[in-house]
Amino acid sequence: MRKIILASGSPRRKELLELAGVPFEIIVSEVEETIGAYSSPSDIVMSLALQKASAVAENNSDYIVLGADTIVTYESRILGKPSNEAEAKEMLQLLSGKTHEVYTGVAIIAKDKTVTFYERTEVTFWELTEEEIDAYVASKEPLDKAGSYGIQGKGSIFVQHIQGDYYSVVGLPISRLVRELKQFNIDVTHA
């Protein structure tokens, strides 16, 4: 089986690959995450995932390199990782009682092939009180997460409904990824 590199330092992506039985190494991509002029959220996440994977693939051409990126959108506004606690509170207030979209893009690069794809998931929050938001932000959990919440952590109590791939919201649509890896002759279902 060809070696896989995850071009991400995300503990959540690492956990999901381990859960699925995908053998991999980690080399964190040093790409600056800047969002340029793109036509859609799906273009943004696939482009950023490709940039991350490409940066690592340059020096690791014998490997299959995975890059991923996740953003949250609400009414065409992109909610990335908050820069501080005040911004985290603002994002959570914005999402309170509403449905938003989570996009995760994935890029898989090998010497002979590149595949990109994305998953879109709708997440609906309960109405959140100021106290709930303050306590959650004080926990520091939302500070390194797109949209200022972690669906797999304490942020799960805010979620009323989800339509789509839960794992995509966590940071990696693992079921789709395993299927896409078959194009690279990697089949973890028989490992």
Swiss-Prot record:
GO molecular function: dTTP diphosphatase activity; UTP diphosphatase activity
Entry keyword Cytoplasm: yes
Main location group: cytoplasm
Name of the protein: dTTP/UTP pyrophosphatase
Subcellular location: Cytoplasm
Task performed by this protein: Nucleoside triphosphate pyrophosphatase that hydrolyzes dTTP and UTP. May have a dual role in cell division arrest and in preventing the incorporation of modified nucleotides into cellular nucleic acids.
Catalytic class of the enzyme: hydrolase
Gene source species: Bacillus thuringiensis subsp. konkukian (strain 97-27)
PANTHER family documented for this protein: BIFUNCTIONAL DTTP/UTP PYROPHOSPHATASE/METHYLTRANSFERASE PROTEIN-RELATED, BIFUNCTIONAL DTTP_UTP PYROPHOSPHATASE_METHYLTRANSFERASE PROTEIN-RELATED
Gene: maf
EC number assigned by the record: 3.6.1.9
The family this protein is said to belong to: Belongs to the Maf family. YhdE subfamily.
Gene Ontology CC annotations of this record: cytoplasm
Cofactor: a divalent metal cation
UniProt signal peptide: none
HAMAP family: Maf (MF_00528)
